[in-house]
C-alpha cells in the first residue's frame, strides 16, 4: 500500500510539473523557454538533466549560473568594442545607418539566457564573434578595397535589396497576412512566412502581420537573429551548441565531414548553396569577418572554419538561404 501511494504521489508530481511548465521547441512552434531554461525533447522547460541532456532542443546550457567576475555581456563586448567591430555600420552609404544599435543588441542578447553565458570567457567571446561574423556577412556593404578593409562593413544593410518577392509559402500554421511580404530583414535576413511565424511566436510578437518590425525595432531585429542562432532543427544542431562545444557530431555527421567548428555554422545557415563544393567566396567572407572579430577579442578561432568539404545538412524549415 505504501509503495502504491509513493508511486501515485510521484505521478501526480510529474503531472503538476508538466501542467505548469511552458511548452517550447518544435511542439510550440520553436518557442524558447523563459529565463534561459532548457527545452527538453518533449517540449517542456526546466533545468534538470532530463531537460538539458540528450536530445535537448534549445538553450541546453540551462539557466546560466553566475560566471566569472566581469562575465556580463557588456563586459565581454563593451560599446567601444562593438563599434570597432561594426566600424562602418553607420556610414552614410549604408541603408541600415543608425539602426543596429549597441543597446538593441544588448537588450536582445540578455533575453536569451544561454547566449554568451556558456563556457569560459574565451568561449563566450567566441560565440559573440561567430554570431556577429555570420550576420555581418548577411548584411555586409564591404568590397575588396573598402576603407579599413571589407570586414569592417558588417551590418550595412537592413532590408533585402532590389525588388524582393513576397516569400509566401501556403501554410495553415503560418498563414501569410494580406499585403505582407516576408523578404530578408535584419541581421540574419530572415525570410519566408514559415520563419517569421515561429520567430514571432517564440518572441511574443506577431511578425506575420507585422514583418517590418524586424526592420524598425532594433531589439526585435536582433532577437530574430538570436532566435535562429539558439534554435536547433533536426538534423541541424543550433549554432549556439556548435560554437560552445555542446554539439557532438553523429557518425553520419562525421562521414559527411561535419566536424565541430565555425564551418558547421555556415552549413546550418546556408549549406545547400555554399558548402560541399570546395572553395566558395561567400564562405571565405564569413571566415574573414570571424577572424577579424576573434583578433579584436584576442582569442583563437578554433578549428574547422571552412565547409568546402562538408555535405549539406539538407533543407530545413528554418532560414535555408539568405
Curated annotation (Swiss-Prot):
It is an enzyme of class 3 (hydrolase). The keyword RNA-binding does not apply. Keywords: Allergen, Carbohydrate metabolism, Chitin degradation, Chitin-binding, Disulfide bond, Glycosidase, Hydrolase, Plant defense, Polysaccharide degradation, Signal. Disulfide bonds join 24-39, 33-45, 38-52, 56-60. InterPro entries: Chitin-bd_1 (IPR001002), Endochitinase-like_sf (IPR036861), Glyco_hydro_19 (IPR016283), Glyco_hydro_19_cat (IPR000726), Lysozyme-like_dom_sf (IPR023346). It comes from the Eukaryota. SUPFAM superfamilies: Lysozyme-like, Plant lectins/antimicrobial peptides. It catalyses: Random endo-hydrolysis of N-acetyl-beta-D-glucosaminide (1->4)-beta-linkages in chitin and chitodextrins. Residues 1-21 form the signal peptide. Defense against chitin-containing fungal pathogens. Belongs to the glycosyl hydrolase 19 family. Chitinase class I subfamily. This is Endochitinase. It comes from Actinidia chinensis var. chinensis (Chinese soft-hair kiwi).
Amino acid at each position: 500500500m505504501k509503495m502504491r501511494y509513493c508511486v501515485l504521489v510521484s505521478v501526480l508530481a510529474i503531472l503538476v510539473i508538466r501542467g505548469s511548465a511552458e511548452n517550447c521547441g518544435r511542439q510550440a512552434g520553436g518557442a524558447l523557454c523563459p529565463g534561459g531554461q532548457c527545452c527538453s525533447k518533449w517540449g517542456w522547460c526546466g533545468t534538470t538533466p532530463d531537460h538539458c541532456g540528450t536530445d535537448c532542443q534549445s538553450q541546453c546550457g540551462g539557466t546560466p549560473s553566475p560566471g566569472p567576475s566581469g562575465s556580463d555581456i557588456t563586459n565581454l563586448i563593451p560599446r567601444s568594442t562593438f563599434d570597432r567591430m561594426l566600424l562602418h555600420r553607420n556610414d552614410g552609404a549604408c541603408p541600415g545607418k543608425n539602426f543596429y544599435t549597441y543597446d538593441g543588441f544588448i537588450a536582445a542578447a540578455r533575453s536569451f539566457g544561454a547566449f554568451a553565458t556558456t563556457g569560459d570567457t574565451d568561449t563566450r567571446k567566441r560565440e559573440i564573434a561567430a554570431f556577429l561574423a555570420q550576420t555581418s556577412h548577411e548584411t555586409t556593404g564591404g568590397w575588396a578595397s573598402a576603407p579599413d578593409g571589407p570586414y569592417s562593413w558588417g551590418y550595412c544593410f537592413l532590408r533585402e535589396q532590389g525588388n524582393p518577392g513576397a516569400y509566401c509559402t501556403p501554410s495553415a500554421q503560418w498563414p501569410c497576412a494580406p499585403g505582407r511580404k516576408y523578404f530578408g530583414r535584419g541581421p540574419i535576413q530572415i525570410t519566408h512566412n514559415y520563419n517569421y511565424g515561429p520567430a514571432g511566436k517564440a518572441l511574443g510578437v506577431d511578425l506575420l502581420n507585422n514583418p517590418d518590425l524586424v526592420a524598425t525595432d532594433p531589439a526585435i531585429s536582433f532577437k530574430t537573429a538570436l532566435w535562429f542562432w539558439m534554435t536547433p532543427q533536426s538534423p541541424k544542431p543550433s549554432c549556439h551548441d556548435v560554437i560552445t562545444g555542446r554539439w557532438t557530431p553523429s557518425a553520419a555527421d562525421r562521414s559527411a565531414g561535419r566536424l565541430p567548428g565555425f564551418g558547421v555554422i555556415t552549413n546550418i545557415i546556408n549549406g545547400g548553396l555554399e558548402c560541399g563544393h570546395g572553395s566558395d567566396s561567400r564562405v571565405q567572407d564569413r571566415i574573414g569577418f570571424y577572424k577579424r572579430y576573434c583578433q579584436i577579442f584576442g582569442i583563437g578561432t578554433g578549428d574547422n572554419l571552412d565547409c568546402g568539404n562538408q555535405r549539406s545538412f539538407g533543407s530545413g524549415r528554418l532560414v535555408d538561404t539568405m
